[in-house]
Amino acid sequence: MTDFVIEQILSPQECTDIIALGKHNGVKKEDNIVNSNDVGVDKSIRSTEIYFLNDVSLYQKIMPHVVRLNKWNYKFSRVEPLQLGIYREGDHYDWHVDDDGVSYDNSAGPFAGLNRLLSFSILLNEEFEGGEFVINNVLPLNKTGQILLFPSTIKHKVNPVTQGTRYSLVGWCCGELWR
């Protein structure tokens, strides 16, 4: 069994619409990854522009596919706000995991006590070079509208974009560990 699932779920027009929605209605996040001393942004780990989307119709379009493709049978109870990532020339996200086994603390509101169980990334365009999504030394995403679904504990990265702009939509399904 592979560590990820990939499938075409959105049309190119739907992807273009998501990009526009994110740029116009998304909530921009200014800072990304801070260094180990929590002082400043560490762009050597991640350099990208981020917009959070909490659009109900977007969840209704994507989540049935996530549920259907969940071959690991994770029991998740919440989905974090979707994140539009804009990677311009030179932008990247170094090797990381989306969940390190430490549950969200009480300051996380409805996510308190939960962990990221399942991660997904949807490629929204192909008009860029570099910027490959890498998981287990495989470059699985290469078509607009493809979703990549994988356990949140698997290491992955986005290589630096060398030309153009890469757009992706990512999300995380959260729940209690070992359920």
Describe the predicted segments one by one.
Residues 1-147, 153-179:
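Fe(II)/2-oxoglutarate oxygenase catalytic core
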